[in-house]
């Protein structure tokens, strides 16, 4: 996709705070998280619910969430029944793929205004058992839907953490190098939180409990005061034979949250006297060997940047999802990226990784970061379980 004479622009962008696993947002149904961000981005964009053409959300762990959770989120936000709403599933890339699909729909003339984003409540993901034909004797094992539908490679039947170990070995990323990436992520996120960098992008979620109504508006997952000495003491989690390097501290978390953006053509924004946050310049997706799925952003970023007519040096800010520190280090190494341009307010190792939401979450953070630092060009990218990568180029001004 190329911007053309009437590019697709992003008018507003917001996200919830990211909750820890079984934490502050764990009791909130996923569609309610979606509803919260949809309402917020419509209000910021000065768009009435009935003016929306379509709602597209990334969502991965749908089991037990009811029929079409995105439709539930859309209707909950006051968008009329006449407006279609649907989910897309591309594992970690779902939330960004939803934005790509929205831009595509607008560029083709099928839609005028689209709300796109992603949502996930990993805390509410159920355990599963297949009992259709009954059980004559013995126990029935329960499968964790987070693992079987979200975090286990379908081709090699091992955890995403093993794919990170494969990347660490192939790209020669040491345990110390991974821990350094993780500490930088935590320290940057701590600084960003204390400086209020996330305040503008976060919409509060009101959570009911026995104690009454609680307002959740601060990312819960970052560990302030993180340091290399403490991090180096953790044992490898996925490989315990003495060769492992990936630990809970240098990997992203399991989390809850939602994010959304409002898109329309530039001329539509002008007619409404709205100032875009950025225009969508290009996007790309790529496939890689599933055993090293974490390097998927390398070809995706190269292709998206080439489509935009940019060089990597032209990019002011990169938001690249930190599924694992090993992956982040390999991508930066392969592309020759300056650490000062990548995840400048911390990444998923510190903030968390709610699967279906992360793609749009990093885009929301990218847009607000570009605005805050006065940057012009940005790239959002994620690796994707199963061996893929997705990237989007956006430009302010």
From Swiss-Prot:
Its main location: cytoplasm. NCBIfam families: AcCoA-C-Actrans. It comes from the Eukaryota. The modification N-acetylmethionine is found at residue 1. It is found in: Cytoplasm, Cytosol. InterPro entries: Thiolase, Thiolase-like, Thiolase_AS, Thiolase_C, Thiolase_CS, Thiolase_N. The active site is at residues 92, 383. The keyword Ribosomal protein does not apply. The keyword Cytoplasm applies. The gene is Acat2. CDD domains: thiolase (cd00751). It comes from Rattus norvegicus. CoA binds at residues 223, 226, 252. GO terms for biological process: cellular response to fatty acid; cellular response to nutrient; cholesterol biosynthetic process; dolichol biosynthetic process; fatty acid metabolic process; ketone body catabolic process; liver development; positive regulation of intestinal cholesterol absorption. GO terms for cellular component: cytoplasm; cytosol; peroxisome. This is Acetyl-CoA acetyltransferase, cytosolic. Homotetramer. Pathway: Lipid metabolism; fatty acid metabolism. One of its GO terms (molecular function) is acetyl-CoA C-acetyltransferase activity. Its EC number is 2.3.1.9. It catalyses: 2 acetyl-CoA = acetoacetyl-CoA + CoA. Belongs to the thiolase-like superfamily. Thiolase family. Pfam families: Thiolase_C, Thiolase_N. Involved in the biosynthetic pathway of cholesterol. The record marks 353 as: Increases nucleophilicity of active site Cys. Keywords: Acetylation, Acyltransferase, Cytoplasm, Transferase. The modification N6-acetyllysine is found at residues 200, 233, 235.
